[in-house]
């Protein structure tokens, strides 16, 4: 492996690990928010929260489908 190739590999690994750390932090935030029911107040109408959660779930499902190659991303 040339020095340039090795540096490129190191840089790409560093970039990947930085993005993974960011991803993991976002997942931790979402997990905590989920445990708190995303701040929804059960004493009030929840249609807005239900609509938001439906949209967020669809986005997360799309991400999972991309990673696991399901649905429209199936090979």
Can you describe what each PLM-predicted range is?
Residues 2-35:
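N-terminal acidic leader/helix
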